[in-house]
From Swiss-Prot:
Pfam families named among the record's database cross-references: GATase, GMP_synt_C, NAD_synthase
CDD domains reported for this sequence: GATase1_GMP_Synthase (cd01742), GMP_synthase_C (cd01997)
Positions of disulphide bridges: none
Enzyme class, spelled out: ligase
Domain GMPS ATP-PPase: 202-394
Catalyses which reaction(s): XMP + L-glutamine + ATP + H2O = GMP + L-glutamate + AMP + diphosphate + 2 H(+)
Name of the protein: GMP synthase [glutamine-hydrolyzing]
Length: 519
């Protein structure tokens, strides 16, 4: 049984980062909405609890509250930002609207305490330990609860962190989970290992054996069907399930005509030939392109592609006898997004291709062997299972494929042009050592024509946009500052080698305000 940290989510945009940072310390954790039941918290049996930040103010009538049981379990508690304010207010302290709101970098001076012991960025001129942290708050604690002392402060926030060492309750007004807080990882490590006494028992080799055992116990002798896309998540799920139950797994690979260059061939070779997985190949490219005719709205394209996949998958599943389980490559961020904590207050940005597409009419039991794992853990698992590194570290690819990388209507001609351009882009990034320096890179087809000169002739051809970003969590991203010589080489190759393209542009938009994908 793993030591486990419970993270209660109050709607913070950084909540899943907290979970990732805890996992990085080799400790298992789960993120759940703040309003889970007391019974759930008891049965979870955490060795420590973290209260996330959130957008609410403690002064509103419907302000989220910390379940009282959190303070009664006798385990350490760490409140972050709003979590600290809620803890202070509920334990007898006071919170006020800050006269000076703090958003961004701040320097804090710390007092001796267990949480910050030997953790500092420097010693200031007065001999006090200083921390560089990331703040994001409009309210602040102005009176500590009984039993607490101040353990960090600056001129704007006299109680920037607080501690009740006896009960092992701590609060920090800053965000230790973001990389801008330079010692944040060390602070979280101190909390989970030294204060919560969690063991270093979350590691991939052990997880592989545990996961195989769980799959065998659940599935027994039943057959399992899985929609294999060639992406990282479904590929790792297929490899893990196959390791557990062998030929009881049947994969269905649907070629929708919207895949990357040679993706279908590479996927079939990896799984059918090299790993001896039973894979049914379905070429439905004409069917998908026919259904997409005349559709220009991105959301409608996503829904159409999803609907067609479900219909084809159902048809293939009906041909297989004695299938009792449907396997999916759902990973932990998918679970978090669909849990309904902070999502209740957020608007739809894009429909998620892994959520809501389950064909319920199949009446199959659901098997999601990766639902506990973050993306970096899925990649680590893939390597442990012997999958090729190029596949495991392949950049994310949207479920609708090139359908949402072609702006407007999807046509066969456009898919061919885009496939070639994207392949050149990725090949040159790999050759220059930039592929693994970027988190995601791809080409986008713009259905507009521009005037050019090819030799002595005027040309009027299509435009390709290139997009490459660097990010830790895909919640925010910076455009990758690729060398000009590399961009020039990519542009020259695309224009010279692909008839129909005469202009290449590079997207230098960050996220926010832009999303990573164009549609």
């Amino acid at each position: 049984m793993h030591s486990a940290i419970l993270i209660l989510d109050f709607g913070s945009q950084y909540a899943r980062l907290i979970a990732r940072r805890i996992r990085e310390t080799s400790v298992y954790c789960e993120l759940h909405p703040f309003d889970v039941s007391p019974q759930f918290i008891r049965e979870f049996s955490p060795v420590g609890i973290i209260l996330s930040g959130g957008p609410a103010s403690i002064f509103t009538n419907d302000a989220p509250r910390v379940p009282q049981i959190v303070f009664e379990l006798g385990v350490p508690v760490l409140g972050i930002c709003y979590g600290m304010q809620a803890m202070a207010a509920q334990l007898g302290g006071e919170v006020e609207n800050a006269q000076t709101r703090e958003f961004g970098y701040a320097e804090l001076l710390t007092e001796p305490c267990r949480l910050f012991q030997d953790i500092k960025d420097r010693i200031n001129s007065d001999g006090k330990p200083a921390l560089d942290v990331w703040m994001s708050h409009g309210d602040r604690v102005n009176k500590l609860p009984p039993g607490f002392t101040a353990i960090a402060f600056n001129a704007a926030t006299p109680f920037a962190a607080m501690a009740d060492e006896t009960r092992r309750f701590y609060g920090v007004q800053f965000h230790p989970e973001v990389t801008h807080t330079l010692q944040g990882k060390a602070i979280l490590d101190r909390f989970v290992h030294d204060i919560c006494d969690a063991g270093y028992d979350w590691n991939m080799p052990d997880y592989v054996e545990e996961a195989i055992g769980r799959i065998r116990a659940r599935v027994g002798g039943d057959k399992v069907i899985l929609g294999l896309s060639g992406g990282v998540d479904s590929s790792v799920a297929a490899a893990l399930i196959h390791r557990a139950i062998g030929d009881q797994l049947v994969c269905v690979f649907v070629d929708n005509g919207l895949l990357r260059l040679n993706e279908a061939k590479q996927t079939m070779e990896t799984f059918s030939r090299n790993l001896a997985v039973n894979v049914i190949y379905v070429d439905a490219s004409r069917q998908f392109l026919e259904q997409l005719k005349g559709i220009t709205d991105p959301e409608q394209k996503r829904r159409t592609i999803g609907r067609e996949f479900v219909e084809i998958f159902q048809q293939e599943a009906a041909k297989i006898e004695n299938v009792k389980w449907l396997a999916q490559g759902t990973i932990y961020p998918d679970v978090i997004e669909s849990a309904g904590s902070h999502t209740k207050k957020s608007g739809l940005i894009k429909s998620h291709h892994n959520v809501g597409g389950l064909p319920e009419t199949l009446r199959l039991k659901l098997l999601e062997p990766l639902r506990e794992l973050f993306k970096d853990e899925v990649r680590e698992l893939g390597l442990a299972l012997g999958l090729p590194r190029d596949l495991v570290f392949r950049h994310p690819f949207p479920g609708p494929g090139l359908g949402v990388r072609i702006l407007g209507e999807v046509k066969y001609e456009y898919t061919e042009l885009l496939r070639q351009a994207d392949a050149i882009f990725i090949e040159e990034l790999r050759n220059a050592g930039w592929y693994e320096k970027t988190s995601q890179a791809f080409a986008v087809f713009l259905p507009i024509k521009s005037v050019g000169v090819m030799g002595d002739n005027r040309s009027y051809e299509y435009v390709i946009a290139l997009r490459a970003v660097q990010t830790e969590d895909f919640m925010t991203a910076q455009w990758a500052e690729l060398p000009y010589t590399l961009l020039a080489r990519i542009s020259n190759r695309i224009i010279n080698e692909i008839r129909g393209i005469n202009r290449v542009v590079y997207d230098i938009s960050g996220k926010p305000p832009a999303t990573i994908e164009w549609e």
